[in-house]
Amino acid sequence: GADGSGRSTQIKLLVDWLEAKGYATTQVGLKRSSLASEELERAKNGNILNRTTLSLFYATDFADQLENIIIPSLRAGFIVLADRYIYTLMARDLVRGLDDKWVHNLYSIALRPDAVFYLKLSPEKLIQRNFMKNHTLDYWESGMDLGLSKDMFDSFVQYQKLLSDKFDDMRKTFDFTIVDSDQSVDSLNQELRDHTKKIIN
């Protein structure tokens, strides 16, 4: 799900629940690699990255986590929870007009997860939540680099709709479970727990 969909809160609650049940967990996500995360953040702050360079930065960040965190954790018997995975990166790249085959080849090293939960929320609700949390909208999460609109609000709505459409397309190929995140934190977490129980039992 997008920023503001409740993703990070739900991951934390799932980790607490799984660990209370005796499962060892590891978390991964975007910009968490020791190799590339700081450089990626610095590069993004200038708002000057082209789409291919941005894609390669994120792919490097992912590949480093795959090699040094995800695979070793799975081998050790841990449950790995990803606060966004390659599907977010692929959707962003495809919306930015990168070649479909190139993008799929770039992420062909990724392991297929046991489950993908896509927390879906309307762009209008996402704007509200982002403003409540950060008091602003992010340049990249608003798709400002795409030239959709000079107005950041309008660009955000258009960009998030494009991403949502792309996720809907990808859902058929990658078997996403779409979860409506326009509900209370507790009720959303219970729904995710119910889905997770089917996998770990």
Where are these regions (language model features)?
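Hydrophobic positions on the alpha1 helix immediately C-terminal to the Walker A/P-loop
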Residues: Q10
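Conserved nucleotide-binding/hydrolysis micro-motifs of P-loop NTPases
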Residues: R32-S34, I86-Y87, L121-I127, V185
